[in-house]
Every structure is written in C-alpha cells, then in structure tokens.
C-alpha cells in the first residue's frame, strides 16, 4: 500500500491532475468529503488529507510514504527523514519580508512577526541582524500596523493584500512551489514502485509546462 499525504486547497487542486496522469484518481472529491483517508482508483494507493504544515511530519515518520508540500512548509519544518525528488511547479508564490510603505529601516533589534519562525531566524542570522521573532498564525499584515512588529515574513502571491493594508513586499527570501516528498525508508522498501510514480509525475509536470 502506498499512502500519499495531501492538504486541501490550492495544492490539492493542482496535484490531482498530476496524480491522474499516473492513474491515481480519488474515489470521492477530497474537497467535499469529510473522510480523511480516501481510497483511489488503484487498490494499493490511498490519500491522507492533513493540514499543510503536517504533511512533512506524516511523511518523515512513515505514516505516509509520499506527500506534497509547499517549499515554505519544508523550509520551516527542516526534517531529516525526507527526500525531495521533484519540484511539481504548482502553487507558485514567494516568501518575502514586508513592511509599512515608505517606512525607514529600523535601527537596532528588528521585530519580525511570522508563522515561519525557523526561516526568519536563519534568514536574519545569515545577515548578522539581531531580531526578535514573534510567532503569529494568521493576519500577519496587522502586526506592523499596530506596532507589534517592524516587519513580517509571509508568502506573497500578487502582493495585493499587503498593499491593501499599507505594506509593501521588500526582500525575497525564497521562490516557493510545491514539492513531492518521500519517506526515506519507503524509498528503500518500495523503490521500484515509488521511482515509477516519481518518473510518471515528472513527465506530467513537464507535459503541463510544454503547453
């Protein structure tokens, strides 16, 4: 049995056509179903529906053999028990710093609000900046407006939400897309099966971008 961990939303919607190219079609619509384990058209493949931030945990610990996760989630997670064999080139966006439009660069210690705490600490440590990182779970744009933080680090798509709240994107930390991740033990134990799936998905990704 191959178990693939996916999260609902944009990543799921973009991943399903790629899985379909490998003959893997869920038995019911994961967006509408309340089930968290969904059988597929292949008797030896099932889907697990989990939170986006939990995908790497399920895969690293072997509860899922494979998963699809955004590079932002993988950068924050930083686990060791995963292979990342394929960039699926879906759910593209940017991980950026942002601050109030026209605001001067703060002197001294920087206060940064983000849900990407590990990414923020690494990014500013590499620059030699002293920072206080404040963990938030949502509505990052509010933090600079009410004096909670000087800057935020967040995923940016169009930047419209930032600008609507008086903020502007500033420094690019990473270009983000969704990646296929594989449990290291599963790759050893089911190598031929998983490698065949990786190759089929790679072909589907390339075919999608040829059009």
Swiss-Prot record:
Q: Which InterPro entries match?
A: ATP_PRibTrfase_cat (IPR013820), ATP_PRibTrfase_CS (IPR018198), ATP_PRibTrfase_HisG (IPR001348), ATP_PRibTrfase_HisG_short (IPR024893)
Localization terms from the record: Cytoplasm
The enzyme's first-digit EC class, named in words, is transferase
Q: Which Gene3D superfamilies does the record cross-reference, listed alphabetically?
A: Periplasmic binding protein-like II (3.40.190.10)
Any single Gene Ontology cellular-component annotation = cytoplasm
Instruction: Name a single GO biological process.
Output: L-histidine biosynthetic process
Pfam families attached to this UniProt entry: HisG
Q: What is its main location?
A: cytoplasm
What Gene Ontology molecular-function terms does this entry list? ATP binding; ATP phosphoribosyltransferase activity
Give the catalytic activity.
1-(5-phospho-beta-D-ribosyl)-ATP + diphosphate = 5-phospho-alpha-D-ribose 1-diphosphate + ATP
Q: What is known of its domains?
A: Lacks the C-terminal regulatory region which is replaced by HisZ.
Summarize subunit and interaction data from the UniProt record for this chain.
Heteromultimer composed of HisG and HisZ subunits.
Put simply, this protein is called ATP phosphoribosyltransferase
């Amino acid at each position: 049995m191959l178990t693939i961990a996916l999260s609902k939303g944009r990543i799921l919607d973009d991943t399903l056509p790629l899985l379909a190219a490998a003959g893997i079609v869920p038995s019911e619509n994961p967006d509408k179903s309340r089930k968290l384990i969904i059988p597929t058209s292949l008797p030896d493949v099932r889907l697990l529906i989990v939170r986006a931030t939990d995908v790497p945990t399920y895969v690293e610990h072997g509860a899922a053999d494979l998963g699809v996760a955004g590079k932002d989630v993988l950068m924050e997670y930083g686990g060791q028990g995963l292979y990342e064999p394929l960039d699926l080139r879906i759910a593209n966006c940017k991980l950026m710093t942002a601050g109030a439009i026209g605001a001067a660069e703060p002197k001294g210690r920087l206060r940064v609000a983000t849900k990407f705490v590990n990414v923020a600490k690494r990014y500013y440590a590499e620059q030699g900046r002293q920072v206080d990182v404040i963990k938030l779970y949502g509505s990052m744009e509010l933090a600079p407006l009410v004096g909670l933080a000087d800057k935020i680090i967040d995923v940016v798509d169009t930047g419209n939400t930032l600008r609507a709240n008086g903020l502007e994107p500033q420094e690019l930390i990473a270009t983000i897309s969704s990646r296929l991740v594989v449990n290291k033990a599963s790759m050893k134990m089911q190598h031929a099966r998983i490698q065949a799936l990786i190759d089929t998905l790679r072909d589907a990704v390339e075919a999608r971008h040829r059009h």
